[in-house]
Amino acid sequence: MKVTLLIPARFGSSRFPGKPLAPINGKPMIQHVYERASLAKGLDAIYVATDDDRIKDAVEAFGGKVVMTSAAAASGTDRINDAIEQLGLSDDDLVINLQGDQPLIDPISIEQIVSLFERHPGEFEMATLGFEITDKSELDDPMHVKMVFDNDFNALYFSRARIPFGRDTNDYPVYKHLGVYAYTKRFVNAFAKLPLGKLEDLEKLEQLRALEYGHKIKVAISAFDSPEVDTPEDIRKCEQRLAVD
């Protein structure tokens, strides 16, 4: 089983145009993501998947690999699907989808999600990461997606609202979703052909499509947070974290 990590990156963003190239401590953000991913063991290849020449040039400037995808890609998964077809991966090869706005991703978290497939072959089609929320300001922030899972760590639901809701207490763990996915090439091909899900459209969370169509998502709980950069203000916070990392 070949393991390929893809970092989808687009230049356009309503909240933060040009986000992948935003400088963080003198390097474009996409370089931080790529270099952190390259520290993970067990990966056969890493590519940035983009439709923008500016991102392509920046990645190649630091020695990274790029696969150019269609500008018509409607979602991150569509971009991933386009990339894996170009790369000629086999149906059973493992694909890691790491968001391009996670410059603080810990390599161990990537290894953790890969090991799920290695330890449980054929038991599920998709896996992702969660982290127990420690910053209470994130509990009711819709930018931080919450998740619940069963006793076997199969995802039950993802929401921008706080889930679960404690009717009689606030003293219970709440987990947020970290935007890292793992799946086989075969599953990505099938997923990309599924119609938009009703819950997916309501919450604007693509992973809900898998649950709506009956697919199992296995969850690994990471010991490391991986906050996403959504606004220019997040850059400053990221630089502070990197200073002590």
From Swiss-Prot:
Query: Which BP terms from GO are recorded?
Result: lipopolysaccharide biosynthetic process
Q: Which UniProt keywords apply?
A: Cytoplasm, Lipopolysaccharide biosynthesis, Nucleotidyltransferase, Transferase
Q: Which Pfam families match?
A: CTP_transf_3
Entry-linked InterPro entries: Cytidylyl_trans, KdsB, Nucleotide-diphossugar_trans
EC class name: transferase
Q: Which GO terms describe its molecular function?
A: 3-deoxy-manno-octulosonate cytidylyltransferase activity
Q: Any idea where this protein resides?
A: Cytoplasm
Q: Which GO terms describe its cellular component?
A: cytosol
Top-level taxon in the UniProt lineage: Bacteria
What is the E.C. number?
2.7.7.90
State where it is primarily located: cytoplasm
**Reactions accelerated catalytically:** 8-amino-3,8-dideoxy-alpha-D-manno-octulosonate + CTP = CMP-8-amino-3,8-dideoxy-alpha-D-manno-oct-2-ulosonate + diphosphate
Q: Pathway membership of this protein? A: Bacterial outer membrane biogenesis; lipopolysaccharide biosynthesis
Role, per record: Activates KDO8N (a required 8-carbon sugar) for incorporation into bacterial lipopolysaccharide in the Shewanella genus.
State the family it belongs to: Belongs to the KdsB family.
Q: What is this protein called?
A: 8-amino-3,8-dideoxy-manno-octulosonate cytidylyltransferase
